[in-house]
Amino acid sequence: NVTNMIADAQWKALPNYFGDSIETGICVVDTSGSMWGDPLEVAVSLGLYCADKCRGPFKNHFITFSSCPSLQEIRGATFAEKVNNMSCSGWGMNTDIEAVFDLILMTAKNSRCKPEDMPKKLYIISDMQFDEARTKYDEYSHKPTYKAPFMQQMKQKYKNAGYEMPALIYWNVRASHCAMFHDTFEGEDCCFVSGYSPVLFKNILEGTEYVEVTKTDGTKEVK
């Protein structure tokens, strides 16, 4: 199939947005019905890209969006098959971030993963608000309840096992504008992103700190 051959060639020709850095990331990919359309395409694309760049036991794997997350191997001989299989993966109505961190650590320990092969970033890609995708939140302030104590405890758990905890990046791909900020979790290593664009995709993977906003005339501006 010529179309599949072209897609495979284009996929293999993509640049390494992580650059010379040893940093890699693993994705929690929301494939629920509400993601249909551009959000699902963004989620699957980033999930496949990061899985391809991962090392050790995380190579060619992604994590399901579920209260009981699982590490799934990407199946398929062609790019089209991989996209289809990931798009049809299991999903839930929310995701338990603590369970995701525990899953990554358990996988690393069970496979005796080298510290340098541990993903440095955890991307959670969904169309839900951050609060809606968590198992615990304040219903009055609508702010996460997993603050510094949770993050500190999780970091210590990773440190005790000889690893560094991945930085958390929550990406809401349904929003109509793009924004990145780092003031949540009381200064802990956590980032919220909303919207999507090629510029945003590139900068997230490169770890660039910026804000891209949609102006009243509909154009986008990166600051």
What does each model-found stretch correspond to?
Residues 1-223:
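Acidic, glycine-rich A-domain
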